[in-house]
Amino acid sequence: MSNLRIVCQHCPSVVFNNKRPDVVKRPTMSAMLHSETQEDLETDDFFLLKDPFAFDNVSVSKPLANNYKLLACADCEKGPLGYYDSKNNEYLLLCSLEKN
C-alpha cells in the first residue's frame, strides 16, 4: 500500500504523510454543521483516521455543532481540511485534498 501525502493548500506545510488510510463516505462538513439529525445527509469521501498522531501537522478547533471539530493546518491555521467526529472518534480528512 502506498503512502498518502497531503500538503496544505495555503502554505507549504505537510499535513499528512503516512500510510494511505481507508476511504469512507460521511456527511459533508456543511451538512453535519447545519443538521440536527444524521439521517439523509449529503455525503462526501473522506480519508478515515482514528489516531490524531497519524497527522504530521493539524490543528483541531473548539467543539462546534453536535460536538464536531474542524481540522486545519497547524502552521497557517487555514482550513477546513476535514473534521473530527468525537462521537465516533473519527478524524475525517477530505479526499479532495489529494493531488494526483
Swiss-Prot record:
Guanine-nucleotide-releasing protein that acts on members of the sec4/ypt1/rab subfamily. One of its GO terms (molecular function) is zinc ion binding. Keywords: Guanine-nucleotide releasing factor, Metal-binding, Protein transport, Transport, Zinc. One of its GO terms (cellular component) is membrane. Zn(2+) binds at C8, C11, C73, C76. It comes from the Eukaryota. Belongs to the DSS4/MSS4 family. This is Guanine nucleotide exchange factor MSS4 homolog. The lineage of its organism: Eukaryota, Fungi, Dikarya, Ascomycota, Taphrinomycotina. Residues 1-100 form the MSS4 domain. GO terms for biological process: post-Golgi vesicle-mediated transport; protein transport; small GTPase-mediated signal transduction. The gene is dss4. InterPro entries: Mss4 (IPR007515), Mss4-like_sf (IPR011057), Mss4/transl-control_tumour (IPR011323).
